[in-house]
Amino acid sequence: MTFAKISQAAYYVPSQVVTNDDLSKIMDTSDEWITSRTGIRERRISQSEDTSDLASQVAKELLKKASLKAKEIDFIIVATITPDAMMPSTAACVQAKIGAVNAFAFDLTAACSGFIFALSAAEKMIKSGQYQKGLVIGAEVLSKIIDWSDRTTAVLFGDGAGGVLLEADSSEHFLFESIHSDGSRGESLTSGEHAVSSPFSQVDKKDNCFLKMDGRAIFDFAIRDVSKSISMLIRKSDMPVEAIDYFLLHQANIRILDKMAKKIGADREKFPANMMKYGNTSAASIPILLAECVENGTIELNGSHTVLLSGFGGGLTWGSLIVKI
């Protein structure tokens, strides 16, 4: 039987660093105000690179690490809420930029859960036996959709991309998963609203591209629903919580990680964090964190670690995977 494994991880972030002090010069905020509430100290902001540019850098690095040619890739999935355009897909742009002539490519939109949803879908595709190698990338240029006059959202987000190479393997690595959506609460986090508009419509409404968030509702959702889902998944696995080596969670807020560790009953030291440097990068946050953990030696891609990956955000969406990495 064919299974899927994560064989490589890579990330790329824009070079421009925007600190909390930088933000305090253009809005009513301060380093202390932002850090005490979120843990975020700085973020990367793109100056000219679009989402496909960031994702392509990740794709090239994955190929380099694996000593593969682009033509050997079977598929490319890009999880994003900030595509270059609605058409062509960002994934198709990546396919063209790296020369993956044999790959089919598509985008997946599930906000901050996007990488988890994409990884779950890609694993099934490899497991079908029809595909051998795929790139799964989370990439965002959130600075495109931020209202820079709104300090409640502008201080939170950053730009970046991360991804993995998924390959066929004879051993099982993806052990358990739990994927959820609740559209009835979707108004808590929105962006990119396009009004119905034509010479034949009678709707008097304008487009609104900016991201809007009910911060308290999203915070409560993460602590209540997501931590419950993670606990239920661990119980479903018949593993003790201690058997999970690392919890790689979406990097939204340091206080969410603190509270989730307590709710789950896990050692807080097993929850690495990097939102201090990058802010909330939505679909890119988990793969960036994974790639950094591999880079610094915390995690080795040799199947020796049991890792729980979990994303949560707009939709509402949330999902977790227990993976041997």
UniProtKB/Swiss-Prot annotation:
This is Beta-ketoacyl-[acyl-carrier-protein] synthase III. It catalyses: malonyl-[ACP] + acetyl-CoA + H(+) = 3-oxobutanoyl-[ACP] + CO2 + CoA. Its main location: cytoplasm. It comes from Streptococcus mutans serotype c (strain ATCC 700610 / UA159). Pathway: Lipid metabolism; fatty acid biosynthesis. The gene is fabH. Homodimer. Belongs to the thiolase-like superfamily. FabH family. The lineage of its organism: Bacteria, Bacillati, Bacillota, Bacilli, Lactobacillales. GO terms for biological process: fatty acid biosynthetic process.
